[in-house]
A protein has these predicted regions:
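Phosphate-end processing signature that detects enzymes handling 5′-triphosphorylated RNA
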Residues: 1-232
Length: 232
């Protein structure tokens, strides 16, 4: 069994943009030609996340309003397998342009075939005691997408491109929904990530990669009624 452990990431800057799938080749070309010499540190993979929120949807409201300090809670796992798989609880905080995470790695297993929440999420290790981060929290949405990874030659700049986004609204208290989905195929998300100490690199990336940073939340997008917006 893999050991369970908790860690807090360093603060970093994350900037995002949404763009049309038809522009993918333009971004890939700009990344390839960048003087930062990007390479692919990992193969593309599917990311799956269960997003939690309280009864009043405070996390959703904070994100929409752009409140200074925002918190999102999610259990994340990777791949398309339908059997039980190790998962990580992420408590992500964002304040202004800075974000950081509290990670509880290997604390949970997720069973994508489960029909109930009792069977979907299994706690593997109680060494930390009850996890207060999920008290009064309910599963609100499951989001899946494919992610490409790029990293500068010196490891200081990371870029991800997310596509084929789909979300599954969780509005029945005890039953999971992994059948009825909402497709978000009319856009992709590009995200640039740098450590807070390397903030000066953000402007260099913006000069080379053709995007305009904006606030964007996959969780919000999954809950807000879908509109026919095409980023051509």
């Amino acid at each position: 069994m893999k050991p369970t452990y908790s860690t807090t990431t360093e603060k970093r800057i994350e900037i995002k943009d949404a763009f049309s799938p038809y522009e993918l080749s333009k971004f890939e070309s700009a990344i390839k030609l960048s003087r930062l010499s990007f390479y692919c540190p990992y193969p593309s993979r599917q990311i799956n996340s269960i997003y939690f929120d309280d009864y009043s949807y405070r996390s959703l409201e904070d994100s929409i309003e752009g409140n200074s300090l925002r918190t999102k809670r999610r259990i994340r796992w990777y791949g398309m397998q339908k059997k039980k798989v190790d998962a990580t609880l992420e408590v992500k905080k964002k304040q202004g342009i800075y974000s950081w995470k509290q990670l509880y790695k290997n604390k949970y297993k997720v069973n994508p075939n489960a029909k109930s929440w009792g069977g979907m999420i299994e706690s593997k290790d109680e060494k930390y005691g009850p996890n207060t981060d999920l008290l009064n929290q309910l599963p609100r949405s499951i989001i899946s997408y494919n992610r490409q990874y790029f990293c500068s030659f010196d490891g200081k700049v990371r870029i991800t491109i997310d596509q084929n986004l789909q979300s599954f609204l969780q509005n029945i208290p005890f039953s999971t929904n992994l059948i009825r989905s909402k497709k978000h195929h009319n856009f992709m998300i590009i995200e640039v990530k740098v450590d807070s100490k390397d903030e000066h690199l953000v402007e260099l990336v913006r000069q080379e990669i053709p995007f305009a940073p904006r606030r964007f939340s996959k969780y919000c997008e999954s809950l807000i009624p879908q509109k026919d917006i095409y980023l051509f």
